[in-house]
A protein has these predicted regions:
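Bacterial N-terminal signal peptides that target proteins for export
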Residues: 1-12
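Conserved RNA-binding domains used in RNP assembly and mRNA/RNA metabolism
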Residues: 21-133
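Hydrophobic alpha-helical targeting segments used for export or membrane insertion
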Residues: 10-22
Length: 133
């Protein structure tokens, strides 16, 4: 006699697929408005302990693309610095130590908090080797 019971991992897979299908079906026909937009901010890259901070930054504005075009870099370089500050997350792949003190254009997911705002970085571009106001 054969045992027709499912392995726990197979059963879990079916549950995940069913849930995903349900979410997909609910989302069809209506645009999602709860998606976190990609934002861009321009500021000075500094380090506090092991944290990388974008200081003297512009207000984070919704970006039109997830990548940075040469035209967008030129426009960002012309922006004056601001008064905002963002702790940057996920900077390791971008080797931030090479850009300490530089004027930077940062794109990523904005995470607003009561005590600080953070950007989970998706694009990390140097605009100038100095960061003078």
């Amino acid at each position: 006699m054969r045992n027709h019971s499912l392995k726990p991992s197979t059963a879990f897979g079916f549950v995940v697929l069913a849930a995903a299908g349900s979410v997909y079906a609910q989302g069809r026909g209506s645009a999602r408005t709860d998606q976190t937009p990609i934002v861009e901010a321009v500021g000075c890259l500094s380090q506090t302990g092991s944290n990388w901070i974008l200081t003297d930054a512009t207000e984070a504005a919704t970006a039109t693309t997830t990548f940075t075009t040469p035209e967008a870099l030129k426009a960002a370089a012309e922006k004056p610095l601001g008064t905002q500050q963002y702790r940057l997350l996920g900077t390791s792949p971008f080797s931030p130590d090479r850009h300490k003190g530089h004027k930077m254009a940062i794109k990523g997911l904005l995470i607003k908090g009561d005590s600080e705002s953070r950007i989970n970085v998706t694009s990390f571009q140097m605009l100038a080797e100095t960061c003078a106001k």
